[in-house]
Amino acid sequence: MSKEVLEKELFEMLDEDVRELLSLIHEIKIDRITGNMDKQKLGKAYFQVQKIEAELYQLIKVS
């Protein structure tokens, strides 16, 4: 797989994962306001952060 293709795929994955994280953060914020904190959503958000970190690390290695 070429460097350009790998970078493109990594950017697409990052875009998708960042959007998912933003959605989760929005949901968590609403849950907090309504008093319905959901620890599962916090766990999912934390997992998304770890995925994003790994993808950024891969991007550094490829660049």
Curated annotation (Swiss-Prot):
It comes from the Viruses. It holds the Pfam family SSV1_D-63. SUPFAM superfamilies: Hypothetical protein D-63. Homodimer. This protein may be involved in virus assembly. This is Protein D-63. It comes from Sulfolobus spindle-shape virus 1.
